Amino acid sequence: GIVDFAKKVVGGIRNALGI
């Protein structure tokens, strides 16, 4: 759903910032 997609996007952004 939209919530799962949003969580995936946020997770990707946080992972990118963590590098």
Curated annotation (Swiss-Prot):
Main location (coarse class): secreted
Coiled-coil spans in chain: none
Pfam families assigned to the protein according to its UniProt record, in alphabetical order: Antimicrobial20
Keywords noted in UniProt: Amphibian defense peptide, Antibiotic, Antimicrobial, Secreted
Signal peptide: none
GO cellular component: extracellular region
Record localization: Secreted
InterPro entries: Aurein_antimicrobial_peptide
Expression by tissue: Expressed by the skin dorsal glands.
Biological process terms in GO annotation: defense response to bacterium
Function: Shows a medium antibacterial activity against L.mesenteriodes, M.luteus and S.uberis.
Protein name: Uperin-2.1
Higher taxonomy: Eukaryota, Metazoa, Chordata, Craniata, Vertebrata
